[in-house]
Amino acid sequence: MNEGVHGEIHVADPSICRVSEASKETAVESVSRSVGATGDTAAVEFTAPSSAAIDDADEIFHHEQKTIYRVTHSFTEESRCACELIEGHGCPVRHLEADCGAVVLSFVAADLESFRDIVVNLKSAFDGVSLRRLTQSEPDSATGSLVFVDRDELTARQREVLETAHEMGYFEHPREANATEVAAALDINRSTFTEHLSAAQSKLLDTILDV
């Protein structure tokens, strides 16, 4: 059996896409993406409160105080998004969400080496790339590749942020707590929480993937 790797990546770069920009100002739900029939355009749809002021997106549906918006763009090197980069490696994006100006994407790579290549390319194209979850298929044989993580690589504050986020269900699907709620539990503001979490995840990602 192929030792596939299921990864979930957090990208905090504000330039990544229009949906991430919208999520800075309001709650964004139900993000979906599709490629046009000609293969040179993509459309992204997301749901947000109708009261939100969202520019540069077409309103396509409205119901019960919520509006579905659509953003369409052509594929160019200048406007290439993280989804296109990942799919360029032959890995469809399985899950996409936006929160607090960042996006979370999940995909399955054929093996750890392929996953590492995608992450390296993401990190070269965008700032604030960090690992949220990494699951590897159980191999048919008992042999495996163990990775030892030195907890001392993380500061005490970074460990506290990770542990609190985990305990409160921040990494669950669907989330049991959002960034604002976890930050409140830690008695810090949301931007500080995001900064500590991103730094901790980046250190773990570098260790696990050896990049």
From Swiss-Prot:
InterPro entries linked to this entry: DmsR-like_N, HTH_bacterioopsin, WH-like_DNA-bd_sf
User: Has the keyword rRNA-binding been applied to this entry?
Assistant: no
* Keywords from the UniProt entry: Activator, DNA-binding, Plasmid, Transcription, Transcription regulation
Q: What happens when the gene is disrupted?
A: Cells lacking this gene are not able to grow anaerobically by denitrification. Inactivated transcription of the denitrifying genes (nitrate reductase narA and nitrite reductase nirK). No effect on growth under aerobic conditions. No effect on dimethyl sulfoxide (DMSO) respiration.
BP GO terms, sorted: cellular response to nitrate; positive regulation of DNA-templated transcription
Reported impact of residue 100 to S: Normal growth under denitrifying conditions. Normal growth under aerobic conditions
Cross-referenced Pfam families: DmsR_N, HTH_10
**Expression induction:** Constitutively expressed regardless of cultivation under aerobic or anaerobic conditions. Increased expression under denitrifying conditions.
Keyword Membrane assigned to the entry: answer is no
The chain positions of domain HTH bat-type read 154-205
Q: What does this protein do?
A: Activates transcription of the denitrifying genes (nitrate reductase narA and nitrite reductase nirK) under anaerobic conditions.
Identification of the protein by name: Transcriptional regulator NarO
